[in-house]
Regions:
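Eukaryotic phosphoinositide-binding membrane-targeting regions
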Residues: 1-102
């Protein structure tokens, strides 16, 4: 069953899509160091990220200064919700430099 999932590679490349497994979003040679699930909040122009990848765990935001995002998502803010009762939401768009790619 395909679900809306995302991954982030060691190089800071952000990929998302409807896939069976998070690894289906990786290209040969990619090293994934975090992933989870996503949904679009069109009212507030945001991509909401949450949960974690069973295989790769939660994104390790402290490892990146720049996140490389597909240019299709230009103009959308990116937020990661921990939903664990301990952490505040992580505003990816404010905390990391966003670089767009085609």
């Amino acid at each position: 069953m395909t679900l809306p999932k995302f991954v982030i590679t060691m190089d800071g490349v952000f990929r998302l899509g409807m896939v069976n497994q998070h690894k289906d979003l990786l290209k040969p040679g990619d090293q994934c160091i975090g992933g989870g699930y996503y949904h679009f909040d069109f009212i507030s122009n945001r991509i909401i990220l949450d949960r974690s990848s069973y295989d790769f765990g939660k994104p390790k935001w402290h490892l990146w200064e720049t996140l490389k995002v597909p240019s299709t998502y230009r103009g959308l803010r990116i937020i990661y919700k921990y939903d664990d009762g301990f952490h505040d939401d992580f505003n990816v768009s404010d905390e990391l430099a966003i670089e767009y790619y085609d």
